[in-house]
């Protein structure tokens, strides 16, 4: 379950210093279905709304991911008490925990470099690494995750968060794609980019912000996981941006809707329509002709909506 907030920018009241209203969404990453939403009250933020959203969800046996704003003891403990698992990003907004994670993995790197064989033997079941490379039209992304599950090593973190079982360090390098005059790909490799940058990005920045080319974050979980599993959960967290928020703005024009008093109701209606389409896509295995036939059937007889929209929902759970 992925939880993230989304702004309704066009619904902002035309008053000086008035902030855009926000909706907090919860999405099932396996099916891309929206399972809950609550409006974020004015003069508050996601941090106060997240516990209210968690309260109405049954997260038993589910893994809940939230961006860095969910890295508070209260929100992590609530997920633990509701019998859910979590993979939580830790950024510099939690300086003590962030630095402790960095210290743990810097120490592990020193041990590994000093005596690789002994390190591998002693940490076979506790330490894992995972790396991947993804290419798209705009950039090449290298991702590396290291995970450690040694109780003694993470004892300082467990003093405050006793339910933590795994800690991880993630490094993501984003390199802008480049082509020469003939259209050939001349994007530098990871090592070259880290040493001297590139033509488009001569001085790569490092940090935990989306604008940084080199992003480093920590992660913690109340479940014993491998580096590959944590990397997958971290990657899946972005599905809510790509599969839900982008679709709401581009296809449903949510970001251009100026309705104010009815904005929350309209948001529910948009997500109901979104879920209808997602359910039909799942059932049809993305067969476009099938989707058109179903829409025609529902138009002629709305009771058909029960068969295609509501009856299949329990089968996913």
Task: Tell what function each PLM region has.
Residues 76-84, 106:
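Short, surface-exposed basic-aromatic patches at helix termini and helix-loop junctions that form
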Residues 74-75, 96:
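Phosphate- and divalent-cation-binding pockets in alpha/beta enzyme and binding domains
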Residues 247-317:
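A short, flexible helix-boundary coil/loop motif
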Residues 220, 224-258:
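Short amphipathic alpha-helical "interface-anchor" segments enriched in bulky aromatics
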Residues 91-92, 96-230, 235:
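An anionic, glycine-rich sequence signature occurring as long contiguous blocks
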Residues 85-90:
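Short hydrophobic alpha-helical runs that function as membrane-insertion/retention elements
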Residues 1-74, 82, 287:
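Conserved, well-structured functional cores that handle cations and Mg-NTP chemistry
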Residues 51, 231, 266-270:
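Predominant activation on well-ordered alpha-helical scaffold segments within soluble catalytic domains
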């Amino acid at each position: 379950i992925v939880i993230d907030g989304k702004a309704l920018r066009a619904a902002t009241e035309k008053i000086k210093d008035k902030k855009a209203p926000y909706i907090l969404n919860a999405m099932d990453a396996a099916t891309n279905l929206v399972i809950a939403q609550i409006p974020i009250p004015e003069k508050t933020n996601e941090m106060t709304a997240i516990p209210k959203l968690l309260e109405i969800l049954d997260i038993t046996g589910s893994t809940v991911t939230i961006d860095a704003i969910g890295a508070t003891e209260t929100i992590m403990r609530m997920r633990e008490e509701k019998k859910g698992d979590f993979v939580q990003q830790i950024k510099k907004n939690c300086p003590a925990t962030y630095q402790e994670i960095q210290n743990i993995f810097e120490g592990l790197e020193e041990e590994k470099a000093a005596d690789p064989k002994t390190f591998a033997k002693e940490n076979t079941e506790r330490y894992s690494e995972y790396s991947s490379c993804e290419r798209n039209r705009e950039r090449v992304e290298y991702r590396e995750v290291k995970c450690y599950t040694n109780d003694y090593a993470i004892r300082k973190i467990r003093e405050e968060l006793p339910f933590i079982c795994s800690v991880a360090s993630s490094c993501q390098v984003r390199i802008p794609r480049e082509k020469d005059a003939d259209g050939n790909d001349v994007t530098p490799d990871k090592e070259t980019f880290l040493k001297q940058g590139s033509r488009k990005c001569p001085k790569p920045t490092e940090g935990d912000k989306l604008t940084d080319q080199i992003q480093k974050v920590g992660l913690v979980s109340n479940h014993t996981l491998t580096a590959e599993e944590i990397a997958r959960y971290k990657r899946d967290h972005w599905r809510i941006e790509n599969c839900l928020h982008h679709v709401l703005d581009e296809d449903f024009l949510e970001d251009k809707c100026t309705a104010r008093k009815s904005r929350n109701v309209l948001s529910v209606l948009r997500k109901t329509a979104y879920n209808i389409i997602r359910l039909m896509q799942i059932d049809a295995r993305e067969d476009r002709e099938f989707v058109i036939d179903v829409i025609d059937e529902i138009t002629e007889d709305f009771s058909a909506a029960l068969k295609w929209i509501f009856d299949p929902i329990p089968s996913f759970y």
